[in-house]
Amino acid sequence: MAANKERTFIAIKPDGVQRGLMGDIIKRFEQKGFRLVAMKFLQASQDLLRQHYIDLKDRPFYPGLVEYMNSGPVLAMVWEGLNVVKTGRVMLGETNPADSKPGTIRGDLCIQVGRNIIHGSDSVDSANKEIALWFKDEELVEYKSCAYEWVYEN
């Protein structure tokens, strides 16, 4: 996959949905120059959430995390672009909003770690696993944005 074809999984959590922050978050990724290739709005099942957070299953907060993520709808997305995993994480800010810089999503829009409004893949490998877990291949849309030439040099 070409460098500008890297993909990441981003999910707006139930608190972000309930607070009406979906449009602002999508706008930030679009304005950065990333391309949305898949999106679905769903009530994630506990089974899906347990699989998604399997690496955290032995942590004391795991049951509460699954319950919180299951408490309302989630907006699951796949974004594509140059270094989108790393840059996406920078855009999100630190997991704990109190440690996030102004200008980041968490730094601007939330206060507590337990309500940090958004998830983003932490590595290319994690992104690939998360995308495969949440989306079927045929749900990933291939298209060339007319803005492509204005975002990338070549």
Curated annotation (Swiss-Prot):
What does this protein need as cofactor?
Answer: Mg(2+)
What's a Pfam family this protein contains?
A: NDK
Alphabetized, the UniProt keywords read:
ATP-binding, Cytoplasm, Kinase, Magnesium, Metal-binding, Nucleotide metabolism, Nucleotide-binding, Phosphoprotein, Transferase
Which reaction equation describes what this protein catalyses?
Answer: a 2'-deoxyribonucleoside 5'-diphosphate + ATP = a 2'-deoxyribonucleoside 5'-triphosphate + ADP; a ribonucleoside 5'-diphosphate + ATP = a ribonucleoside 5'-triphosphate + ADP
What is its subcellular localisation?
Answer: Cytoplasm
**What EC identifiers does the entry list?**
2.7.4.6
According to its UniProt record, which residues of this chain constitute the active site? 119
User: Chaperone as a keyword?
Assistant: no
Among InterPro entries, the record links this protein to: NDK-like_dom, NDK-like_dom_sf, Nucleoside_diP_kinase, Nucleoside_diP_kinase_AS
Q: Where does ATP bind?
A: 13, 61, 89, 95, 106, 116
EC class name: transferase
One example GO MF annotation: metal ion binding
Give the GO biological process terms.
CTP biosynthetic process; GTP biosynthetic process; regulation of apoptotic process; UTP biosynthetic process
| GO CC annotations, alphabetized | cytoplasm
- Please report which protein family the annotation says this sequence is part of: Belongs to the NDK family.
Give the protein's biological function. Major role in the synthesis of nucleoside triphosphates other than ATP. The ATP gamma phosphate is transferred to the NDP beta phosphate via a ping-pong mechanism, using a phosphorylated active-site intermediate.
Put simply, this protein is called: Nucleoside diphosphate kinase A2
Which organism is this protein's natural source?
A: Xenopus laevis
